[in-house]
């Protein structure tokens, strides 16, 4: 079994019963694959597939001028490499993007040759098409310096859908069926029945019209319409009555209106009897071909075809006319015998299209098209061209209508065609097929579609969303180009004169900057990043809105199984509209979610894994992942629990066709991190999933002792850790960088065989949490590709570590844990267990004002030297300074306009010559309520403005760091080259060389060591081939040096060029403050099971409940928080955590008494291999076993995968192993060893009964009391009402609301109430009066008129009612 570099150091013992058959796919694959498909940057231009940018270009180009004599063709596109890297973009507030250039060809045709087109001239040119933001390797975008994520959208797939209104529209509760054809782009076409069973259509939700208008408009006559939707009854008229051609099926269930006889006149069905199956068999046996029917049987039937007099050509009756006596008379007169009528009945063949045709007043195709034109463009006069153009543009034009590949596939599947490809526009037979199915549905045949089925909803990823925006921009460009193409020849224009890239740039910028789906990345911890990128939203442009979404859309659907997580979704108005992808879910080429299954053949599980979409899944019988199988993969049980078409049932093994790949298949990443998820209530699991994303990274991350085994995947895929790009040996490591000498077999010729990893140190995340990477390798370590070299925020040895393992006791403690409050020991705070670092960014800009430029300087009048003490000569704070609220960080002065001086001031000015008061101090100060340490300063200066010393120093430091990297690379490259050289030179014969090397001497190692390396090249060798090799190595070293010098120059040029700043800004300074936040009462904390609470008190360590050996608990939780919430998982986690820590203590004790390695091996084997998944400890050397044991002292980490976790029996075994009887007796444990006798810390008395005690992974959430606590002294007031503003951001007051007023009224506290409603709120004169009175020492309140009363009076006056206040 292969262990990675970090896995060896600390193996997580897994309780999984099932082997891993399918690895969890890369968690950010959807985002990265989608965007790389969009760009196709690494694909040669000629081999690009028609998707993404290529598809957008080819769909708009070629653009042809109005006269047709000039056209602009698209050849290919190319993306340049970005000007700044990701880190530089974040610092400078730029977008990480690449310039898109398209090669286009302008073709001008000869106007003189009218017959066939002759090309007159061709101009080809590369044209700039705007900037395209690039995705970072972790799946986010850097837009204006901030990281953003484009969330995937779950929208209704294009295609055709049939539904009914569930009887809600009409009072009778009748089901009204409707169909809707939804294209990817273009007009929607709806068909719907009304309560009278007439079929209407509407375009884009406009006014409805009878559907036969549309059928006539596509060129069908009434006869053809009827022939398409009905079968006919054939009658032959006799002198008396008529004969009906006998079709047995059509008579079943009808009541005979006359005696039905066979050919011999024998009565088979008597009058008024219902015709049943036996009657029909008798008629068939009698070989009846025709049935004689009386004349009145014909009356009221509907003619299927026009009846024309053969002699005169006169139309006697039209199709869809009713047969009346007068019609029959005319027919007999004309001698017409055979007529056809529509066959309808009340059960399964309604006369809907016939009734619709009767309502329709249009006569022919033209009239129908005019009617449609009038509906679409009311009030415009219909000319023939306009009418034709509009109708063709609606559904038949490729520019305006696109069903898309998906839409065509879904359409063809739904209407029952075999092929899934076809034209992207709507065809006549598509419209007919849709109406036919809709009529069949109304007739009671077939099923309506389930709109929430994941086969009818597809995911639009970044690439597709960006492509749509880009295409929209291109279409705007196309319009402009069309206009100008006409003048292209006469004005001798080049392609770049025709194309203006502004519309494309603005469309892209708007999408990435302000679209509803482009969101500020949630960067609180690695899990929140991953979850954000795997989120699927039903909101956004082209999706649902919160208000319109009902319960059905938000609900969990059977097809979500393995595709979308049923647990993780926000609470509140977005519940069910924003979802998370399940762990193994994957998108297919059409954008439908698929999930993997193992193929089962003849009740034997094979290794074949198939990805099935929701549509395909419905056809198979699928067993769950926990079905029992023997070692050969044979299903054992007589009945297996399985699913088919959304229903769960027990079936025999031979019927099973597929099986789930893993028990965790149905949940998302966040939910799969919750141990014992199977024992938690779904609502609490939902809260647990959401709260893990709010966990603040702690100063020292600690792995969870009870995990689920997915922590490593999560940490590595999030990109917070540093992974080895290639294997090799660690050559150098410090806190900020790791240098790796790459293995020879992985080094590529022509590339540097050195990998340098610069770690991220104390950087601010989007949520102001701290991102910091710490190396976990030592010099000389051998690492392989993909191994973790450095831990990031919230990771510990390459595993996700969101919180800390706390010793938890479930017991009440003096009411301090009432209502989910949390009691915490002072030791937790003293040990900095939950201390987190938050980084605040404070900006100041110096602008060019009308009165002159603002200046960043240390020279500020009216400021004491104490306040300027922390600023350097440029007026910018030193790094490392500890600052409090109100301290100056950057000194800045702004010119202010000359004010009119009083004569006294003029006199003072004349005497003291004080000129400094024409500037005002606008320095950057630390905001109220904040204090911390300055950890970084960035200075940006506009081009052409002299840099100050501080800015120059920052640039020099950056260059020094870069030079260090280059020197390391060169050192290793040269070292390798000289090693190769030494191997080659030793033993060769020389023709001469430095230090008087004689001709014919053999070179030995000692001679080489004595020489300076660079003098080796002066040795002249006798062997020509070797001499050539020597020359080649010398050249390659010189070439590398030259490359490094060029790279350094380029870096210097980039750093010394002026910064791009917003207009009017001369200089910008960013100061970063690190704020340490310790745990304090009021902070929100939570476990992983939705068990959240607020810290109520931090108790001295000596007062906490303690065990018999004197160890106190860290946290005391209320036991009443468990039963009603039904999240029992937390109790099991505490038991297993107790065992994990106990085992760690036993290993620690062995190490302390320096037990033999063999004893350690035996104990570790007992832990790892007596239950659950087996670990290969045999392959470990003694050193590795020792290192493993050292890392296990703080607890043996357990993995209990979701739905496949540790059983009670296994937990019992682990507890027995951790606490042998002597320890259990000492601690006075219960027999099952999960409850311990505790003693009261204040009295020393033992508690009445034993307490459940153990370790739980507990998190500190991002809702910190420091961010919410706030007090107002004097602050801003609202403009109109003159009441204080509200909220911390506005430095507002606390609202004294309606209910608080009632409370004071109830106590009769009238003066307090008057004070609250006047001088403490909006009595403007009273407010100032109070201050005056206090100054005079006269403590009286003069309450006046509240301003809001004046506002009310004004409002009433605006209604025309005059109110005057009688002041007496």
UniProtKB/Swiss-Prot annotation:
It is an enzyme of class 2 (transferase). The keyword NAD does not apply. One of its GO terms (biological process) is DNA-templated transcription. Its EC number is 2.7.7.6. GO terms for cellular component: DNA-directed RNA polymerase complex. Keywords: DNA-directed RNA polymerase, Nucleotidyltransferase, Transcription, Transferase. One of its GO terms (molecular function) is DNA binding. Transmembrane segments: none annotated. It comes from the Bacteria. InterPro entries: DNA-dir_RNA_pol_bsu_ext_1_sf, DNA-dir_RNA_pol_bsu_external_1, DNA-dir_RNA_pol_su2, DNA-dir_RNAP_su2_dom, DNA-dir_RNAP_su2_hyb_sf, RNA_pol_bsu_bac, RNA_pol_bsu_CS, RNA_pol_bsu_protrusion. It catalyses: RNA(n) + a ribonucleoside 5'-triphosphate = RNA(n+1) + diphosphate. DNA-dependent RNA polymerase catalyzes the transcription of DNA into RNA using the four ribonucleoside triphosphates as substrates. Belongs to the RNA polymerase beta chain family. The RNAP catalytic core consists of 2 alpha, 1 beta, 1 beta' and 1 omega subunit. When a sigma factor is associated with the core the holoenzyme is formed, which can initiate transcription. This is DNA-directed RNA polymerase subunit beta. It comes from Burkholderia vietnamiensis (strain G4 / LMG 22486).
């Amino acid at each position: 079994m292969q262990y990675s570099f970090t896995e060896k150091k600390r193996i997580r013992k897994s309780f999984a019963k099932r082997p891993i058959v399918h690895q969890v796919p890369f968690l950010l694959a959807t985002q990265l694959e989608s965007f790389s498909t969009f760009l196709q940057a690494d694909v040669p231009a000629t081999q690009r597939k028609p998707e993404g940018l290529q598809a957008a270009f080819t769909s708009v180009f070629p653009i042809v001028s109005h006269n047709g004599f000039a056209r602009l063709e698209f050849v290919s596109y190319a993306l340049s490499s970005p000007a700044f890297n990701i880190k530089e973009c974040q610092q400078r507030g730029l977008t990480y993007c690449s310039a898109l250039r398209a090669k286009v060809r302008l073709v001008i045709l000869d106007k003189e040759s009218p017959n066939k087109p002759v090309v007159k001239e061709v101009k080809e040119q590369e044209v700039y098409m705007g900037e395209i933001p690039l995705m970072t390797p972790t799946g986010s975008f850097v837009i204006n310096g901030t990281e953003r994520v484009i969330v995937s959208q779950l929208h209704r797939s294009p295609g055709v859908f049939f539904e009914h209104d569930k009887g809600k529209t009409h009072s009778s509760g009748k089901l009204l069926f409707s169909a809707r054809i939804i294209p990817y782009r273009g007009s929607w076409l709806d068909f719907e029945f009304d309560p009278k069973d007439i079929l209407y259509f509407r375009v884009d939700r406009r006014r409805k019209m009878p559907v036969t208008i549309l059928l006539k408009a596509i060129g069908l006559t009434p006869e053809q319409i009827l022939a398409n939707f009905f079968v006919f009854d054939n009658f032959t008229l006799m002198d008396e009555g008529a004969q009906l051609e006998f079709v047995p099926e059509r008579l079943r269930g009808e009541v005979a209106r006359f005696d039905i006889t066979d050919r011999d006149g024998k009565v088979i069905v008597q009058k008024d009897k219902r015709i049943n199956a036996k009657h029909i068999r008798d008629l068939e046996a009698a070989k009846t071909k025709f049935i004689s029917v009386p004349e009145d049987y014909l009356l009221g039937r509907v003619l299927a075809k026009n009846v024309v007099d053969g002699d005169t050509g006169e139309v006697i009756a039209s199709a869809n006319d009713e047969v009346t006596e007068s019609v029959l008379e005319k027919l007999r007169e004309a001698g017409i015998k055979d007529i056809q009528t529509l066959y309808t009945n009340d059960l399964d063949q309604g006369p809907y299209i016939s009734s619709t045709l009767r309502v329709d007043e249009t006569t022919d195709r033209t009239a129908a098209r005019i009617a449609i034109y009038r509906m679409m463009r009311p009030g415009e006069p219909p000319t023939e061209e306009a009418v034709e153009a509009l109708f063709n543009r609606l559904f038949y034009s490729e520019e305006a209508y696109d069903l898309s590949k998906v839409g065509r596939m879904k359409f063809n599947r739904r209407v029952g065609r075999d092929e899934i490809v076809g034209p992207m526009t709507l065809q006549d037979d598509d419209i007919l097929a849709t109406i036919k199915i809709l009529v069949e549905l109304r007739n009671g045949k077939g099923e309506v579609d389930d709109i929430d089925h994941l086969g009818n909803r597809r995911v639009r990823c970044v690439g597709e969303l960006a492509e749509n925006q880009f295409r929209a921009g291109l279409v705007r460009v196309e319009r402009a180009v069309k206009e100008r193409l006409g003048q292209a020849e006469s004005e001798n224009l080049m392609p770049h004169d025709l194309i203006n890239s502004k519309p494309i740039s603005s469309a892209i910028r708007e999408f990435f900057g302000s679209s509803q789906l482009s969101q500020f990345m949630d960067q609180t911890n690695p899990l929140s990043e991953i979850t954000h990128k795997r989120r699927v939203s039903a909101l956004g442009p082209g999706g649902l809105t919160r208000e319109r979404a009902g319960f059905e859309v938000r609900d969990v659907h059977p097809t979500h199984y393995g595709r979308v997580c049923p647990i993780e979704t926000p609470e509140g108005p977005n519940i069910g509209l924003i979802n998370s992808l399940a762990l193994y879910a994957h998108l297919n080429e059409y954008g439908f979610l698929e999930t993997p299954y193992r193929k089962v053949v003849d009740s034997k599980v094979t290794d074949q894994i198939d990805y099935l979409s929701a549509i395909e899944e419905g056809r198979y019988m699928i067993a769950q992942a926990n079905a029992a199988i023997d070692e050969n993969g044979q299903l054992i049980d007589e009945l297996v629990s399985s699913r088919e078409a959304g229903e769960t049932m027990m079936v025999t093994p031979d019927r099973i066709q597929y099986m789930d790949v893993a028990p965790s298949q149905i949940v998302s990443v966040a939910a799969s991190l919750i141990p014992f998820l199977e024992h938690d209530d779904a609502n609490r699991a939902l809260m647990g999933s959401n709260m893990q994303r709010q966990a603040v990274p702690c100063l020292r991350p600690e792995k969870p002792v009870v995990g689920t085994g997915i922590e490593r995947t999560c940490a590595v895929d999030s990109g917070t850790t540093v992974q080895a790009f290639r294997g090799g040996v660690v050559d150098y490591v410090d806190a900020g960088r790791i240098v790796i000498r790459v293995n020879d077999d992985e080094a590529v010729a022509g590339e540097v065989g050195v990998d340098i990893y610069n770690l991220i140190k104390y950087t601010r995340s989007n949520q102001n949490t701290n991102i910091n990477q710490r190396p976990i390798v030592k010099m000389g370590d051998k690492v392989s590709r993909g191994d973790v070299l450095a831990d990031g925020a919230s990771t510990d040895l390459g595993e996700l570590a969101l919180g800390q393992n706390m010793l938890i006791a479930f017991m009440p403690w003096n009411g301090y844990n009432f209502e989910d409050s949390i009691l915490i020991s002072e030791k937790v705070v003293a040990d900095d267990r939950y201390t987190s670092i938050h980084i605040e960014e404070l900006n100041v800009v110096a602008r060019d004002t009308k009165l002159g430029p603002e200046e960043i300087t240390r020279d500020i009048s009216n400021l004491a030297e104490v306040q300027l003490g922390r600023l350097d000569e440029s007026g910018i704070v030193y790094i490392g300074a500890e600052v409090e609220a109100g301290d100056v960080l950057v000194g800045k002065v702004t010119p202010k306009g000359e004010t009119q001086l009083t004569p006294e001031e003029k006199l003072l000015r004349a005497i003291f010559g004080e000129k400094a008061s024409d500037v005002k101090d606008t320095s950057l100060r630390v905001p109220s309520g904040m204090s911390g340490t300055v950890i970084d300063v960035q200075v940006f200066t506009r081009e052409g403005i002299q840099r100050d010393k501080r800015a120059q120093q920052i640039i020099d430091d950056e260059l020094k760091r870069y030079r260090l990297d280059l020197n390391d690379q060169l050192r290793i490259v040269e070292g390798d080259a000289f090693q190769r050289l030494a191997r080659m030179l030793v033993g060769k014969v020389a023709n001469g060389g430095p230090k008087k090397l004689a001709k014919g001497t053999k070179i030995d190692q000692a001679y080489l060591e004595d020489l300076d390396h660079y003098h080796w090249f002066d040795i002249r060798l006798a062997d020509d081939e070797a001499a050539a090799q020597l020359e080649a190595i010398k050249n390659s070293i010189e070439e590398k040096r030259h490359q490094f010098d060029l790279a350094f120059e380029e870096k210097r040029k980039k750093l010394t060029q002026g910064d791009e700043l917003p207009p009017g800004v001369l200089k910008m300074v960013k100061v970063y403050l690190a704020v340490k936040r310790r745990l304090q009462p009021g902070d929100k904390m939570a476990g992983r099971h939705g068990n959240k609470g607020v810290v109520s008190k931090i108790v001295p360590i000596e007062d906490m409940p303690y065990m018999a050996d004197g160890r106190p608990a860290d946290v005391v939780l209320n036991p009443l928080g468990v039963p009603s919430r039904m999240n029992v998982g937390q109790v099991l986690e505490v038991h297993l955590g107790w065992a994990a820590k106990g085992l760690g203590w036993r290993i620690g004790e062995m190490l302390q008494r320096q037990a033999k390695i063999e004893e350690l091996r035996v104990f570790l084997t007992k832990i790892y291999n007596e239950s659950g998944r087996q670990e290969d400890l045999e392959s470990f050397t003694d050193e590795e076993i020792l290192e493993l044991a050292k890392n296990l002292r703080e607890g043996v980490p357990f993995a209990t995968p979701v739905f496949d976790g540790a059983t009670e029996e296994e937990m019992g075994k682990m507890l027995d192993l951790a606490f042998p009887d002597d320890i259990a007796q000492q601690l006075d444990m219960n027999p099952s060893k999960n409850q311990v006798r505790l003693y009261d810390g204040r009295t020393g008395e033992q508690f009445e009964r034993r307490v459940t005690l153990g370790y739980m992974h507990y998190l500190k959430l991002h809702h910190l009391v420091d961010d919410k606590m706030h007090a107002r002294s004097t602050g801003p007031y609202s403009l109109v009402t003159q009441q204080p503003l509200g909220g911390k951001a506005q430095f507002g007051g606390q609202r004294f609301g309606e209910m608080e007023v009632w409370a004071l009224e109830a106590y009769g506290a009238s003066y307090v109430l008057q004070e609250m409603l006047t001088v403490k709120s909006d009595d403007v004169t009273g407010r100032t009066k109070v201050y005056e009175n206090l100054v005079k020492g006269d403590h009286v309140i003069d309450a006046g008129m509240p301003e809001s009363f004046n506002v009310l009076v004004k409002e009433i006056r605006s209604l025309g009612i005059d109110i005057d206040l009688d002041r007496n």
